[in-house]
Structures are given as C-alpha cells and as structure tokens.
A protein has these predicted regions:
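N-terminal glycine-rich FAD/FM-binding segment characteristic of electron-transfer flavoproteins
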Residues: 1-258
Length: 258
C-alpha cells in the first residue's frame, strides 16, 4: 500500500529585532511544530512506500525551510510564492494551500503541525480540511494505515480517542507524538546544492487576487506587541479562618467576585 503524503509546513520568524516581523532567511527556520508531522510522513513512506511532498506559502526566503525538508528526505517541495499572497490571514492561507493540494491530486494523507511558532492560531489545518471537504482529526499521536482508511489516535482531556478516517484525510499532529530525526550534514549539503524547490504562483494555483492576500482575508492584524507579564505574590497568614476571610476580601477587592 503505497502512500502519497502531503505535509504543509511554514517558515517561522526567530530572533527578529524587537517589535518587528522580519521574514528574511537569517531570521527564519522551519516551524518546529511541523517537524513531528514531517517525521510521521517519512516513517510512513519508509514502512509502506510512496512519496512525501512538502508545501509551504511565503516569500522567497521561505525556500530555506523547504530545503531543510529536502535534506530530511522528502521527495518534492513546493513553495507558493506570489506578491498577491502577502497579508493573507488563516482562511486565505488555507485557500492557497487547498488549491495546491488539489493540484497534487491524487493523495492519501495531508499532515499539518498543530500550530505555528509565530502566529500560534492552529486554524489553517482545520480550515484547509473544510475547504477540501476532507475528514479531519486534530492533535493526532499515531497513524496506522489500513485498507482504504487510516486509524488515528488523539489525546485530549486525559482521554485517548481512536478514529477511522476514510482516504484521503487530513490530520494535525501533536508535537509530543514522535521525536523528529536530526538533519545530517551530507543531506544539508546535497539539498542546498540541488535547490530543487518548485515555485508556484497564483496563476498556477488557479486563484484570483481577490481570493487571497488582504482582499481574501476576512480578518486583519491591527498591531503586534509583546505582552509583559507582571506577577505579584501575596502570602496569607494567620489562622485558617483569618486566611479564609482575607482571601474572600481579596476576591471582592480585585473584582474576581461581586
């Protein structure tokens, strides 16, 4: 049973100057939450055969993250790169990724990380599943292929849940599900020397500018700022009754209770 697997990944910002989102290559890396999804895909290919394709959306600097996936051993990498995609929110991003996935039909499985380290929404995977009308499960720990379906396990609220998903399907992978492999130096050298990442523009996706970018985004980011947490610790002393009275008074004074 050979599997055609697509893994959607993102190049995320790290170590950028304070208060700025800089997407140049020196400040970007492969989203760490995508690494477990990629590892599961590679393990499935090694066990059952088939191919793994990584897809990302972003500026040209995002090519570096895709080259890293090629160094890990994926068969094909595609970057959705077009100026019209700038300013896309999660829905517009899902629209572009969904168009790319459709173009890669037939496929058996689409994998996402549960979220990205920069925007941290966790929305793009489920939105893509809805747009493609694919059965989907989030926070998946394990995937077991069977005839015309996948058995997946997720963990939530202290429970283990098992689902049977018909092919094709889309899942988001829990970061604790598996330990990602290291990138070997030889793989890095070969991937950067080859630079086989494909670039697809909006025309190749069959989309119009109105469907993506700011025109296709029902939400907009108004501002970005770092939130500084201020913690204060207050110790209650005295007898148990006195502490209870002080705690009740504190709840009222802070507006926690009326």
């Amino acid at each position: 049973m050979k599997l055609n697997i697509i893994v959607c990944v993102k190049s995320v910002v790290i170590g950028a100057p304070e208060g700025r989102v800089v997407r140049s290559s020196e400040f970007c890396e492969l989203n760490p939450y995508d690494r477990p999804a990629l590892e599961i895909a590679l393990n499935l290919r090694e066990a059952y055969g088939g191919a793994v394709t990584t897809v990302s959306m972003g500026p040209e600097s995002s090519e570096i993250a895709l080259i890293e996936t090629m160094a890990l051993g994926v068969d094909r990498s595609i970057l959705l790169c077009d100026s019209a995609l700038a300013g896309s929110d999660t829905l517009a991003t899902a629209t572009a990724l969904g168009a790319a996935i459709k173009k890669l039909t037939p496929f058996d499985l689409v994998l996402f990380g549960i979220r990205t380290a920069d925007s941290d929404t966790g929305q793009v995977g489920p939105q893509t599943a809805i747009l493609l009308n694919l059965p989907s499960v989030t926070w998946v720990y394990s995937i077991e292929p069977a005839k015309n379906k996948f058995f997946v396990e997720r963990r939530a609220d202290g429970f283990r849940e098992k689902f049977a998903l018909p092919l094709p399907a889309l899942v988001t992978v829990h970061p604790a599900s598996i330990q990602p492999r290291d990138v070997g130096l030889h793989g890095i050298q070969s991937a950067f020397a080859a630079r086989k990442v494909e670039f697809w523009n909006l025309k190749e996706l069959g989309l119009s500018p109105e469907q993506v970018g700011e025109p296709g985004s029902p939400t907009q980011v108004i501002s970005l700022k770092r939130v500084k947490k201020v913690r204060k610790c207050k110790f209650l002393t005295g007898s148990t009754e006195e502490q209870a009275q002080d705690l009740a008074r504190l709840f009222v004074d802070t507006g926690f209770v009326g």
